[in-house]
Amino acid sequence: MEDAGGGEETPAPEAPHPPQLAPPEEQGLLFQEETIDLGGDEFGSEENETASEGSSPLADKLNEHMMESVLISDSPNSEGDAGDLGRVRDEAEPGGEGDPGPEPAGTPSPSGEADGDCAPEDAAPSSGGAPRQDAAREVPGSEAARPEQEPPVAEPVPVCTIFSQRAPPASGDGFEPQMVKSPSFGGASEASARTPPQVVQPSPSLSTFFGDTAASHSLASDFFDSFTTSAFISVSNPGAGSPAPASPPPLAVPGTEGRPEPVAMRGPQAAAPPASPEPFAHIQAVFAGSDDPFATALSMSEMDRRNDAWLPGEATRGVLRAVATQQRGAVFVDKENLTMPGLRFDNIQGDAVKDLMLRFLGEKAAAKRQVLNADSVEQSFVGLKQLISCRNWRAAVDLCGRLLTAHGQGYGKSGLLTSHTTDSLQLWFVRLALLVKLGLFQNAEMEFEPFGNLDQPDLYYEYYPHVYPGRRGSMVPFSMRILHAELQQYLGNPQESLDRLHKVKTVCSKILANLEQGLAEDGGMSSVTQEGRQASIRLWRSRLGRVMYSMANCLLLMKDYVLAVEAYHSVIKYYPEQEPQLLSGIGRISLQIGDIKTAEKYFQDVEKVTQKLDGLQGKIMVLMNSAFLHLGQNNFAEAHRFFTEILRMDPRNAVANNNAAVCLLYLGKLKDSLRQLEAMVQQDPRHYLHESVLFNLTTMYELESSRSMQKKQALLEAVAGKEGDSFNTQCLKLA
């Protein structure tokens, strides 16, 4: 969770803490997505995020969960989780694929999203939040150049038509319940298989996908590769958008009884070369305003190679080699070895806030709530980005379903042959990341199932030589692999998550070793420039660090504190600039398990490191650590003094504000505590209407009077005017 006030937070195990840099540009594009998001929750909306926050998002997030540490909570879980879903491409993602960082309560939390190689982050959505780049494709891929002629046997290659088709409007019929985290000091590290519906439960953070600033560091990008596919795709693949390419049908399924149906991949010789200069005209359109469109095209092609690189398994490599070397006939692939996804549920998600308003405030009040839904935006990536940026994640899930249905992968299509494109994979990534963010883990698992281990041959560009000529690598965003691995820990299977993360780490380590030896990512000979090689090394070091971070969070969830601390120390090697935040997180883990002396030692190390840094954030970090140290010793008066000092330096620091109110409560000053929280919410509702703050406030209302319902309903009205349909109403305790 990101506190707009400059608060800090530490990673918490529970959140794929669930999925957008600027030149010099290539390097910038590489690493915003890779920044670690130490806890992906944010107190504020995108309007409150500024570009300046990108430089210290990690420090700001370390305190988020400690903010909730001494909460009065009837639920053991604690974790803030409003985050941005970052852009969905590695190059376009801001700093951090939404990845979690150590949480204040001592629990590092994975934030999502999805090394967010993109938006929402590989989504992919860490801390600054801004839909990373408006790279949403507005030109239908089907409008690309058509070949002059096509053989009589040629059939059109399946093409995503999400830009030209509009799904019929669907009426809302309720919403899927979602579970929210409730702030508590020690609950963040508890590994529970599945929390009962009525318990407030933390949800993974998709940090920084929702801000308007282009420069931000967040792990949401770690979680999500930007869901907006680059318009440059037509350069490396001019015919990708052609509705009727002159290539023979890439997939033919001869029905054979008693055994899996093999899929025939026909040879490239049947393809008729395009005879018109349309692809070149398309390139000119894409690069309008560029001084050197060819240089730009080559640059983007290099970024594609770098970001898409992956090492397939032996079986998959054999199929791809056969496709690449075929001369005549077809390459047969067992149907069971292909990816055949489809929607597993198509019900409209609805709006829980409006349902509560109907129940408690009446139809007249409920009619005043106006939020975007899947019918009120453009049926394309542009509309999807709009819904996500407005925090209408449930509507975004619905729109993803419509776009996938237009692509032939809708409800009831699971198990049927289909072809994949960069668009369809990005849509699946965003949909799955949103489901995880909303706490619908079982739904996400069902829809992830057809993807297997994400290594089927039809998930690689080489499998479609006529659609993506010359392009190599995996269509699967890196952050989608992280999300696939982390999902199991939210379903009560942390060991399975750890095993999957180890496999991803092995591939990342091998690719990095190849690059450092002067080879290409796949181990072959490389003609890449030295500058390009260094950029690739930085990218894969960052990705490897992201995997280590997820492993540390998983170990923390398993309560293996020794290995978790070792893993966090190893992350410092990959992210040395984030050493103060990581050390603070490790210190708070020590606080959570009651090791005060070790915590004090780490906090002293943080103070030494921050002495070399200039600026307000370093001082706030040291003061926050001191406050938490006193909080862990039940010295509430001294802790309140430190929190108050932080507020003098940064009056908008939500973490300090919330914790100061909690300290007042434990000092027996309930009225003062209530006044502080109420003033905070009234001062800036868009910034402070955070689930953890509201949970504390409603709990204090219950302590203050048996007639707390009226005040809770007033909070509901405030929420209705500011929040989207993703808001978890359980924090209002109205049910």
Swiss-Prot record:
Pro residues: bias regions: 13-22
SMART domains noted in UniProt: TPR
Lineage top rank: taxon: Eukaryota
Gene3D superfamilies: Tetratricopeptide repeat domain
Renumbered residue ranges of the record's region Disordered: 1-204, 237-276
InterPro entries linked: TPR-like_helical_dom_sf, TPR_rpt
Localization per record: Endoplasmic reticulum-Golgi intermediate compartment; Nucleus
Changes after translation: Phosphorylated as the cells enter mitosis but is dephosphorylated at or before the onset of anaphase. The phosphorylated form recruits CENPE to kinetochores more efficiently than the non-phosphorylated form.
A GO term from the CC aspect: TRAPP complex
Pfam families xref list: TPR_19, TPR_6
Phosphoserine: residues bearing it: 109, 184
Result after altering residue 627 to V: In PEBAS; uncertain significance
TPR repeat positions: 545-578, 580-613, 620-653, 654-687
Chain intervals with Acidic residues compositional bias: 34-50
Keywords: Deafness, Disease variant, ER-Golgi transport, Nucleus, Phosphoprotein, Repeat, TPR repeat, Transport
GO biological process, one term: regulation of kinetochore assembly
Function in brief: Component of the TRAPP complex, which is involved in endoplasmic reticulum to Golgi apparatus trafficking at a very early stage. Also plays a role in chromosome congression, kinetochore assembly and stability and controls the recruitment of CENPE to the kinetochores.
Subunit structure: Component of the multisubunit TRAPP (transport protein particle) complex, which includes at least TRAPPC2, TRAPPC2L, TRAPPC3, TRAPPC3L, TRAPPC4, TRAPPC5, TRAPPC8, TRAPPC9, TRAPPC10, TRAPPC11 and TRAPPC12. Interacts with CENPE.
Disease annotated for this entry: Encephalopathy, progressive, early-onset, with brain atrophy and spasticity: An autosomal recessive, progressive encephalopathy characterized by central nervous system atrophy and dysfunction, spasticity, microcephaly, global developmental delay, and hearing loss.
Protein known as: Trafficking protein particle complex subunit 12
